[in-house]
């Protein structure tokens, strides 16, 4: 006797296997590091991922990865998040192509050319303006466009930093920008609660990514130098470990979590 397929059981099974099937997420900085890890996790769970990035080499590598994944639904767009028009066009394009926006991870950020090397008294105006324009104003541009288009019950996760929770000497511009991201997150969470739109942040500590390597290049730190960050876990974290926390906050298991900042730092001391 042939089996009779129950559509409700089949749908339930698919949701268990692919809990984000039918969902559409935007990820800035999504072609490398934490952004790419987040996009990969969401895609594996069935979501459509819409990546924004500015690095052509990283974007090409991401294209190779996602085009090689059976059934992956994705788009990759060149977007400078410090430019309002590019951000708006990117989000409008998501709606036009995929019909909805269920959530977003705002990961894109810069550390500048003097990260960890210059005190406030020596701060360069252009360096300050660039870091704030991308990390803080750019995140606001993204949030604004996303909140105007996101579905009720959607979720936005902003990537702040341990630098948004503490102050570090010779990191003034980066610290200020990441403190600002946390302030934006908490304000937007209050403003959008009536629609049950969740807005949270993650604060990564020592996570090995291309951005961390750039910082080491600036300060002259060898890649094989002994671990020296004040973390109880005596190692750097990974982009995938951070992406898993972001995916949790974007997904269906965090529906009463908003206005929070999740540290991903191996117990920073």
Curated annotation (Swiss-Prot):
Entry's induction text:
Expression is up-regulated in spores.
Q: What is its EC number?
A: 1.1.1.-
Quick one: which pathway?
Answer: Hormone biosynthesis
| Record's keyword terms, sorted | NADP, Oxidoreductase, Virulence
Phenotype caused by lack of the gene: Leads to slower vegetative growth and dark pigmentation of the mycelia. Also leads to the secretion of a very dark pigment. Affects sporulation and appressoria formation. Shows hyper-branching of the germ tubes, as well as unusual bulges along the hyphae with less melainized appressoria. Significantly reduces the production of abscisic acid (ABA). Highly reduces virulence.
Q: Which InterPro entries match?
A: NAD(P)-bd_dom_sf, SDR_fam
Decide whether keyword Oxidoreductase is in the record.
Answer: yes
Name the residues annotated as catalytic in the UniProt entry: 174 (proton donor), 178 (lowers pka of active site tyr)
- A single MF term (Gene Ontology): oxidoreductase activity
Q: What class of enzyme is it?
A: oxidoreductase
Residues where NADP(+) binds: 34, 80, 144, 174, 178, 207, 209
GO biological processes: abscisic acid biosynthetic process
Q: Which Pfam families match?
A: adh_short_C2
> What family does the database annotate?
Belongs to the short-chain dehydrogenases/reductases (SDR) family.
> What is this protein for, i.e. what is its function?
Short-chain dehydrogenase/reductase involved in the biosynthesis of abscisic acid (ABA), a phytohormone that acts antagonistically toward salicylic acid (SA), jasmonic acid (JA) and ethylene (ETH) signaling, to impede plant defense responses. During pathogen-host interaction, ABA plays a dual role in disease severity by increasing plant susceptibility and accelerating pathogenesis in the fungus itself.
Question: What PANTHER family does this protein map onto?
Answer: DEHYDROGENASES, SHORT CHAIN, ESTRADIOL 17-BETA-DEHYDROGENASE 8-RELATED
Protein name per UniProt: Short-chain dehydrogenase/reductase ABA4
Q: Which gene encodes it?
A: ABA4
């Amino acid at each position: 006797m042939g089996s009779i397929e129950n559509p409700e059981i089949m749908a339930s099974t698919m949701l268990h296997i692919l809990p984000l099937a039918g969902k559409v997420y935007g990820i800035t900085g999504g072609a490398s590091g934490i952004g790419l890890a987040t996009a990969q996790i969401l895609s594996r769970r069935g979501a459509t991922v819409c990546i924004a990035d500015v690095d052509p080499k990283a974007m090409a590598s991401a294209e190779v990865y996602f085009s090689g994944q059976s059934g992956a639904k994705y788009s990759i767009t060149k977007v400078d998040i410090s430019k309002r028009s590019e951000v708006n066009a990117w989000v409008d394009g998501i709606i036009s192509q995929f019909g909805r926006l269920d959530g977003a991870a705002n990961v894109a950020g810069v550390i500048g050319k003097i990260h960890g090397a210059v005190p406030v008294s020596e701060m360069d105006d252009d360096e300050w303006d660039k870091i704030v324009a991308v990390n803080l104003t750019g995140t606001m541009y993204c949030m604004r466009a996303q909140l105007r288009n996101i579905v009720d019950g959607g979720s936005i996760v902003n990537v702040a930093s341990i630098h948004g929770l503490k102050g570090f000497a010779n990191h003034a511009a980066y610290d200020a920008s990441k403190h600002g991201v946390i302030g934006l997150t908490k304000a937007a969470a209050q403003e959008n609660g009536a629609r049950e739109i969740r807005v949270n942040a993650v604060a990564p500590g020592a996570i090995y990514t291309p951005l961390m390597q750039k910082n080491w290049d600036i300060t002259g730190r060898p890649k094989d130098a002994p671990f020296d960050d004040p973390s109880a876990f005596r190692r750097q974290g990974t982009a995938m470990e951070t992406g898993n926390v972001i995916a949790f906050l974007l997904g269906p298991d965090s529906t009463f979590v908003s206005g929070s900042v999740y540290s991903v730092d191996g117990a920073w001391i």
